[in-house]
Design a protein with these regions (language model features):
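N-terminal phosphate-binding or glycine-rich loops at protein starts, especially the Walker A/P-loop
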Residues: 1-45
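Short glycine-rich or small-residue beta-strand-to-loop segments that form or flank ligand, phosphate
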Residues: 2-9, 66-71, 96-99, 164-167, ...
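Short Gly/Thr/Asp-enriched flexible loops that form oxyanion-binding sites at enzyme active sites
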Residues: 18-22, 103-117, 177
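Glycine-rich oxoanion-binding loops at beta->alpha junctions
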Residues: 44-99, 104-105, 137-144, 148
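Accessory alpha-helical/coil subdomains and C-terminal extensions
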Residues: 96-101, 109-111, 139-157, 167-262
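Short, acidic/small-residue loops that bind anionic groups at enzyme active sites
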Residues: 113-143, 190-194
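C-terminal non-catalytic interaction/assembly regions of soluble proteins
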Residues: 244-344
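Single conserved hydrophobic/aromatic residue that forms the stacking wall/gate
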Residues: 342-352
Length: 352
């Protein structure tokens, strides 16, 4: 069997580990051939590919990014896009596709499967917001990067007696903000799942200063104040209809400085959260997902996504995985609140 592999959407630590596992087992165990399509769905759309063999994936396990490149190309927004993909797969003798990506990439995979393309999906997103899987690779790396940044920011915030607002990724789900904020000892965590009252946040900040400690506020890029307005970097939409978020951290810092009279600064972690070497957890998870994906292809189990449920790697229908996003349950946020800030004058310990 000749199998195509592609990576779509934002880059993510662990992508190369998936590619490596797929190719190594596919060649050594099953004797399959592989072709890597470049730059997401743009590859099969335009026939852009490269050969993939065991020698091509040697040494890529610890590397961030993806050796195949990526893009946010949506073939369903391009004239004759589906027909072009089918024609290029046939021209290159590709019998099946393994698509590694998030909600958009796997959404395309779901539609192509329904149109007769043999496809298996592998979930990828640092946001950890894909349904039907407990964890996605890249999330653990992003959380560790954000946590280390928060750890470092505590000392500079306290040295200068200022509020530091740390903006992390998370369009619709605040998993990174919640986990990194808790692990880094943040005093306030703001998620897309729950609108926040900026006056209440200012009150928490003032109480922190009353105890002679400088506050750290962690905010997901998709968090919204009570008026429900997202802060956007610009009004442009990508090929999947997403706006570009950015600026909630700066807006919040300005509001807090005005309301508390204390200096507030913003740190936007941005793309650093999804760059560089994956953690051990993400390398192992990505490898296990890749091994299960090539098993599914070999067995002809099309239209499935491999997923982590509890500690097991299972297969679920692609349609189920892309039906809805996995957001942070409010009870998870509620159980964390006791660790975030103090409301008692007797509380004089640091939050971490």
């Amino acid at each position: 069997m000749r199998i195509g592999v592609l990576t779509g959407g934002g880059d993510c630590p662990g992508l190369n580990a998936v590619i490596r596992a797929v190719v190594r087992k596919g060649v050594a165990t099953y004797g399959h051939e592989f072709v890597g399509f470049r730059d997401g769905w743009k590859g099969p759309l335009e026939g852009l590919s490269r050969p993939l063999d065991i020698a091509d994936v040697r040494g890529i396990l610890p590397r961030g990014g993806t050796i195949l490149g990526s893009s946010r190309t949506n073939p369903f927004k391009i004239e004759n896009g589906v027909e072009r993909i089918k024609d290029n797969l046939a021209a290159q003798g590709v019998d099946a596709l393994i698509a590694i990506g998030g909600e958009d990439t796997l959404g395309v995979a779901t539609q192509l499967y329904e149109l007769g393309v043999h496809v298996v999906g592998v979930p990828k997103t640092i946001d950890n917001d894909l349904g039907a899987t407990d964890y996605t690779f890249g999330f653990d790396t992003a959380v560790n990067i954000a946590m280390e940044a928060i750890d470092r920011l505590h000392t500079t915030a306290e040295s200068h007696h200022r509020t530091l607002v740390v903006e992390v990724m998370g369009r619709h789900a605040g998993w990174i903000a919640l986990h990194a904020g808790l692990a880094g000892g943040a005093n306030v965590i703001l998620l897309p799942e729950r609108q926040f009252d900026v006056d209440q946040v200012a009150g928490y900040v003032e109480k922190r200063f009353q105890h002679q400690y400088a506050p750290i506020v962690v905010v997901a890029e998709g968090a919204q104040p009570l008026d429900g307005q997202m802060v956007l970097a610009n009004q442009e939409l990508d090929s999947f209809g997403h706006v570009r978020l950015g600026g909630i951290g700066q807006w919040l810092a300005e509001q807090l400085e005005a309301k508390t009279g204390k200096e507030a600064r913003t740190v936007v972690l941005g793309h650093i959260q999804r760059g560089g070497t994956p953690t051990a957890f993400d390398r192992v998870l990505a490898t296990r997902l890749g091994l299960q994906a090539i098993d599914a292809v070999h067995e002809g189990d099309w239209g499935k996504m491999v997923a982590m449920q509890s500690t097991d790697i299972v297969r679920v229908p692609l349609a189920e995985a892309t039906r809805e996003l996995k957001t942070v349950p409010l009870e998870r946020y509620a159980e964390a609140e006791v660790c975030l800030f103090y409301t008692s004058d007797a509380a004089d310990d640091k939050a971490r």
